[in-house]
Amino acid sequence: MSAAEGPLVVGVDTSTQSTKALVVDVATGEVVASGQAPHTVSSGAGRESDPRQWWDALREALHQCGDAAREAAAVSVAGQQHGLVTLDAQGAPVRPALLWNDVRSAPQARRLVEELGGPKAWAERTGSVPGPSITVTKWAWLAEHEPESVRATTAVRLPHDYLTELLTGQGTTDRGDASGTGWWASGTEAYDEEVLGHVGLDPTLLPRVVRPGEVVGTVRDSAGLPFAKGTLVAPGTGDNAAAALGLGLRPGTAVLSLGTSGTVYAVSTRRPADPTGTVAGFADARGDWLPLACTLNCTLAVDRVAALLGIDREAVEPGASVTLLPYLDGERTPALPHASGLLHGLRHDTTAGQLLQAAYDGAVHSLLGALDLVLDEDADRSAPLLLIGGGARGRAWQQTVRRLSGRAVQVPEAKELVALGAAAQAAGVLTGEDPAAVARRWNTARGPVLEVGERDEAALARIAGVISDAAPLLEREADQR
Ligand SMILES: Nc1ncnc2c1ncn2[C@@H]1O[C@H](COP(=O)(O)OP(=O)(O)O)[C@@H](O)[C@H]1O
Ligand SMILES: O=C(CO)[C@@H](O)[C@H](O)COP(=O)(O)O
């Protein structure tokens, strides 16, 4: 037996690059065991992963947790948002999942926006103007390009739903993750039958949307995982909504998450509806809202630039007037799905370290542009930004965010806030507590604060100028290059 004070729970984060599992003491928030196993994502035109890998990675991550996982009384799975998982009558994937950062459905997104009333109508209806990340556009792409896959599909799931169903045998999802599909109406909090009819998706193929705090089932014996009989399963949610739980986030505090995706978000009590499409009007996992902007190019893109230059990711140098837009995967914020990376202002005396700093600046610029938009008007804009995700460990990321935001930056010591949020949700179904209150009790946001500095307006203006001047290049579709 572990020396934990309270019951134990397991929180899972199945994100783009890996699945992580934490075993957490409900009384103290102490992480008593952890595990992590990688996934692979296809390269080339699309971004796909075989969902069976996520299950194998979950088993491996739990195996690494050892006996502590066997003692867990509840588990919850948080996962990368938006991925389209199509299952056949046996529950097996019909094809690999189309991930959030697959931009092939950009034409379908454009068409759907036009056909169903334009950007404002979509924002009011679903909270978001669908771009290629949003699941409904992926379903429309599949219907057009692989009608045989659509015909073979008897269930449609998101990544966290897929794993939760393998645990419980029940097809369920939650409002946080459902709000990223484009077929969930944020006004009524129900599936939008008109949108579904428009794309030919039968609503009976979708999972039941459970209430926050509902126990969705218990772990099946047949799951073959190291859980005791009767282990409760919590609803789970999308990874950003889980991190908001994991931070015990209150309205008015902004979060910047630096992982495969870059995201900026805040909790709001007001239902968002941004007709420009910059802010996605997601629901959170508790009953509030999570206005969020997301970039496709964050840590992987900057690490790629460092690798190309042959230098360490921390080997940045200041003082350049070079601009690097690191849109290696196309971009979502700004909405440039067909863009590629762009370099401007290179001189004989530009150093490799300056080029790398320019890549950090380009990545952070996109996120900061949306910062004010995700915060309510009455938010305290002098409060520190919370910096999380794998990139938050890096000094170059921390200093870039501090310099370009002109805000104080707080870096929580807790490393895995998505998995911690899932653990807080699992604790909530066990004790009846609000998961965000659990996380506050665990003091998960604790960490050093980098003091406020002067905002680098010159760099911000230079980057904005290049984006604007290069618009025709950045907007050009791949086959026009
Ligand atoms: N010390 C560090 N400094 C900078 N970046 C880091 C550091 N540690 C990890 N990373 C970056 O974090 C990323 C993984 O972050 P994570 O939030 O786990 O991603 P995801 O949840 O999207 O799978 C990797 O791409 C890696 O480049
Ligand atoms: O698409 C979004 C948010 O809308 C992404 O944030 C995904 O949820 C993937 O997250 P990570 O794997 O980068 O954590």
Q: Where would I find each of the regions flagged by the language model?
A:
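Active-site core segments that coordinate phosphate-bearing ligands/cofactors
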Residues: V10-V12, A106, V113-T126, I134-V136, ...
